C-alpha cells in the first residue's frame, strides 16, 4: 500500500475497481493493414517503434524492435482474434507524482482537498486523518461518460466516434 505521513496528517490508499478500460475491435482495411475505419473514413494508425531488451532465464539479453500502433482510442494490440484498441483514462493523465507530492506537503485538510483536485490517481480509495480530528474516506475514480446505447462491458465497435468516451464524471 501507499502511505504518506507528515507532522500534521496521514493518508493511505486501497485499490478500488472502477471500470476504467474500454476495448474496441478495429475494422482493418483489406489491403492497407495500417489503416482502420473510423466514421466512414480510412485512417492510418499512428506508428512508432520501440527498442526493447528481453532478458532470458540464462541471462542472455536479446534486443527486440517492436512496431507500436495508436488509434483514435489509444494503443493497439493484434492477436489471433483480431485487432483491438483500448482506452484507459490513466494514459491521459500523468500527474500522479505531483498529486502524491502535494498530498504529502499538505498541512491541513483544505490543502489535502486541493491536492485531490489534481485527479492523478483515479483508481485508488483514499483514507485520511489529521491532528485536528478530521477523518476522510473517498472512493476515487475518473468514470468515463459513455453513450448508454452500448454495452460497455463487452468489446465495442472501433469504427465510430459514437463509441469514444465523452469526458469523465
Where are these regions (language model features)?
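Mature extracytoplasmic enzyme cores
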Residues: 1-169
Amino acid at each position: 500500500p501507499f502511505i504518506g505521513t507528515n507532522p500534521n496528517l496521514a493518508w493511505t490508499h486501497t485499490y478500488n475497481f472502477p471500470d476504467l478500460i474500454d476495448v474496441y475491435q478495429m475494422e482493418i482495411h483489406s489491403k492497407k493493414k495500417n489503416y482502420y475505419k473510423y466514421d466512414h473514413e480510412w485512417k492510418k494508425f499512428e506508428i512508432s517503434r520501440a527498442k526493447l531488451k528481453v532478458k532470458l532465464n540464462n541471462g542472455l539479453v536479446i534486443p527486440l524492435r517492436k512496431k507500436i500502433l495508436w488509434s483514435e482510442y489509444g494503443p493497439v494490440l493484434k492477436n489471433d482474434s483480431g485487432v483491438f484498441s483500448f482506452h484507459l483514462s490513466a494514459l491521459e493523465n500523468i500527474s500522479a507524482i505531483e498529486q502524491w507530492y502535494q498530498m504529502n506537503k499538505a498541512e491541513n485538510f483544505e490543502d489535502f482537498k486541493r491536492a485531490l483536485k489534481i485527479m492523478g490517481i483515479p483508481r485508488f480509495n483514499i483514507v485520511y486523518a489529521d491532528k485536528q480530528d478530521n477523518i476522510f474516506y473517498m472512493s476515487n475514480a475518473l468514470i468515463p461518460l459513455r453513450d448508454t446505447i452500448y454495452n460497455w462491458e463487452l468489446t465495442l465497435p472501433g469504427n465510430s466516434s459514437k463509441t469514444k468516451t465523452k469526458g469523465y464524471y
